[in-house]
Structures are given as C-alpha cells and as structure tokens.
C-alpha cells in the first residue's frame, strides 16, 4: 500500500496529504468532477514529504486555469482567504477594506454599549448617504470544509439583541443592522435561523445573489497572502 506524503500547512503544522480533500476543494470552486479528479491525480504524482500546501494549491490553480479561467480565479481567491490566518484579525481587516471600497466608514474591534453589558464587535460600519449603521461578527476558518453553524448564529443574535435593546439616548454607537460574516459557508440550520430571526449573513456562497466572492469581484478588493 502506498504511503501518502506529509505536507506543510500554511500555519506551519504538518498533515498527511489527502487527494480527496483537494478534489472537494476544486469542486467547491466550480470545477467539473472529471477536471477536479484529473488535476488531483496529476498533483498526487508530484507531491513529496515536505511539500507545502501553498505549492500544492499553486500547482492546482495553474492546472485549473488551463481548464476554466473563471473557475480558476474563484479557486485562487478562496485559497487566498484561507491563508489569511492563523488568527481572525487579518480577515477582519480584509472585510473592513471591502466595506470601505463600497463606501462605508469602518472601525474595527469597536466596543458598543448594550442594555446589559458592552460588546466588542469585529467591525462597525456607517454609511452616511444611506443613513445606515451596522455591526458585524466575523468567523474565520482556515479549513474550507468548516461551516459556521447554528450555535454561532444563536450566539451572535443574542449579542445583537442586547445592543438593539440599549436605549438610543445612552447608546455609545447606534446600529440598525447586525451581520455575521465568514470566509467559508454556513450550515443549513444557521441559514434557516438567520433568515427567520433577522440576522444578516455573508459568506463565500451566501446570499446567493450577493456572495462574498461576488462583492470582492465587484469592488476589486483581493486578499494578499
């Protein structure tokens, strides 16, 4: 039985190379089954112990670009977001840049007074022309298969409820919208709860007509890793 090589992840940790994970990653970006499997087989033949995940995905991107350029661009952007870690702060700063490019005034890691306690939100944004004020909680994951779940949505909703309940006359920073942002995806339960309870979501593939990828492309704001 062939032993799979050990590769070096972006955060410096080691793991066994899994061709199936590469196939899934390519498919999530829109690659057809045959193309994803063919690329994974080609790369598997070249990977040796000590190869970095960055080298693997750069090779995958080069091969995917030959198959379909739009899919390759989507794949490259998603990988770049995954490599912003290991902490969530670079992702918070990136999303702040995206909102600024869309015309918002943004403050990161701001403390907002609630009815019961004060809350530090990952970013606070105001749009004077639209007279809108929002606060956002960001969840960064460096695993493309990890989804932000119902538990997170419930937690975020409770924080926003406390902020909304604060009397406007004493509120240190008024908001009228609460947002949960992730660089990956949401579980179906998290989406159902958010749509019912009024929590706005923004993720790689949600909402369908205004995804994080779409907004990055329109604003021409891209992560640098």
Residue ranges of predicted features:
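Catalytic cores of nucleic-acid endonucleases
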Residues: 138-206
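Compact, charge-rich alpha-helical regulatory domains located at protein termini
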Residues: 216-225
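Short, mixed charged/polar active-site loops
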Residues: 14, 118, 131-133
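Conserved catalytic cores of phosphodiester-cleaving nucleases, focusing on short active-site segments
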Residues: 99, 121-125, 132-143, 154-157
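Long, C-terminal-biased catalytic regions of enzyme "large/alpha" subunits
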Residues: 1-86, 91
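Acidic-basic catalytic patches of nuclease active cores, encompassing PD-(D/E)XK
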Residues: 77-113
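Active-site metal-binding core of divalent-cation-utilizing nuclease and nuclease-like domains
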Residues: 103-129
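Short, charged, surface-exposed secondary-structure boundary motifs
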Residues: 146-147, 209-217
